[in-house]
A protein has these predicted regions:
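Membrane-embedded alpha-helical bundles of multi-pass transporters/translocases
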Residues: 2-454
Length: 454
């Protein structure tokens, strides 16, 4: 098993294993993000209005369970640590829930479909929370070295970008292969495959990582006190705002992407070509986080820079399409993904540093609780983004598997280009005000270490 050495260094195998955790996450959650909405409307036969309502309702569910799970992870005591046991137990359960979510019964009455959708989706979200919160918190428990954390998060992001690229390239062909006679069979089979990958990746992450940061034992702390401490943590609040915007922009666009290629471009297979064009830029962009961070010495400013250029390149995509100007369209797609990937690495690298800042500022360390609200913020953004898209499409006359009217097509195009592009620029402005640089962070860590020794 990997472990942190006395200098705070983390073995390569542990960094790789941590990265594989996000491979698993993306083979479940990105599959859900990119394909669940069109599965509900075009395969299961559920109305856009019901899907939109589900996305909003599920966030009230998250508002309850995310902080609870975060608090429980902080209180977990085992021979494997606080966070790693959750990967071992929750991953296989979540995989089963993933399969159940993609088990379509289009012959059921509409009310039966909606009830089944609500139950399975909410359980899936809970299962994913029980995996993703401890997984995300684990990085901060592996080391306090800011550069090592940057390397761990780079490993995570590179692995995630590879996973997303592979998933996007193979999913449509797999759905076609296994669903040649029935689309619902295709989705169910792919869900089984991805559920197995999800579980295996988290088992590997569990086996080859170790929690090395010693956390002092604390008395039981009320939620009210923890919330008060969070509100005093300015870097964390900026990171939380960034995550909400990130969730809205990323998942709203992801929910739209297959609609865009199917109905606006007129050919769903373009999605596979698009995915092939962005996979290499994704990997390079993730790897570029570290050199940009070394130049700026501020993870928030690094995220801000990547977000700005993501927005500019995404706005530019509005003027081109895959059918008439494929070279420019796919080149801009690759450029957009390059900058997005750098941002994705940076935004998650920020979070563990905010924990130390909060401990220094308030005397309270609550890794899981803080990551729970980051997760909740991301999910709130996701809910608003997907519900907003579903609501607009439903209002202006979307009909599954039919030629769409001009307004619906316009919504799909703007949801793919101008709306997320503008929001990326807003995200860049928000994160520009993140001021916890490398020098100040190292001073804080030294003060914390000296305080614990005394």
């Amino acid at each position: 098993m990997g472990s942190e050495n006395k200098n705070g260094k983390v073995p390569l195998i542990s960094k790789i294993a941590y990265g594989f955790g996000d491979v698993g996450c993306n083979f479940s959650w990105m599959f859900v993000s990119n394909f669940l909405m069109i599965f509900y409307t075009d395969v299961f036969g559920i109305s856009m209005a019901a899907v939109s309502a589900l996305m909003l309702f599920s966030r009230f569910w998250d508002a309850i369970n995310d902080p609870i799970v975060g608090g429980l992870t902080d209180k977990t005591k085992s021979k494997w640590g606080r966070y790693r046991p959750w990967l071992l137990v929750a991953a296989p359960i979540t995989a089963i829930l993933l399969v159940m979510t993609f088990w379509a019964r289009p012959d059921w009455p509409q009310n039966g479909k909606i009830i089944y959708m609500v139950i399975t989706y909410c359980l899936l979200v809970l299962g994913y929370t029980c995996v993703n919160i401890p997984y995300g918190t684990l990085c901060g428990a592996m080391t306090q070295d800011i550069d090592e954390r940057a390397k761990i998060n780079t490993s995570r992001s590179v692995a995630a970008m590879i996973a997303i690229g592979v998933l996007n390239i193979i999913t449509v062909p797999l759905l076609s292969k296994f669903g040649s006679h029935s689309a619902k069979t295709g989705y169910l089979t792919v869900a089984v495959i991805y559920g197995c990958i999800f579980t295996a990746c988290h088992f590997f992450c569990f086996a080859k990582t170790k929690e090395a940061v010693i956390i002092p034992e604390k008395e039981k702390i009320s939620v009210k006190i923890q919330l008060k401490a969070v509100m005093q943590n300015r870097p964390y609040l900026l990171a939380l705002a960034g995550q909400i915007l990130f969730g809205f922009t990323l998942y709203g666009r992801n929910a739209d992407i297959l609609y865009y290629f199917t109905y606006v471009e007129g050919n769903a297979s373009y999605y596979t070509t698009y995915s092939m064009c962005i996979i290499i830029p994704s990997i390079i962009g993730a790897a570029c986080f570290q050199p940009v961070f070394r130049k700026l010495n501020n993870k928030g400013r690094t995220a801000s820079l990547f977000a700005l250029f993501t927005g500019i390149s995404m706005l530019s995509m509005f003027f081109f399409n895959a059918k008439e100007s494929p070279a420019i369209f796919y080149a801009l797609s690759g450029l957009t993904q390059f900058f997005f990937s750098g941002f994705n690495t940076a935004i998650y690298a920020i979070i563990p540093d905010c924990v130390e800042y909060g401990e220094w500022k308030t005397g309270l360390r609550n890794d899981g609780f803080q990551y729970a609200f980051i997760s909740l913020g991301n999910k709130i953004g996701m809910a608003v983004g997907t519900a907003f898209l579903a609501g607009l499409l439903g209002k202006y006359g979307y009909i599954a598997n039919q030629t769409q009217n001009a307004t619906v097509l316009s919504i799909m195009k703007h949801a793919f280009t101008t709306i997320p592009g503008a929001l990326w620029i807003v995200t860049a402005v928000v994160l520009f005000f993140y001021r916890l640089n490398k020098k100040r962070y190292n001073e804080i860590v030294e003060e914390l270490k000296n305080g614990r020794k005394s």
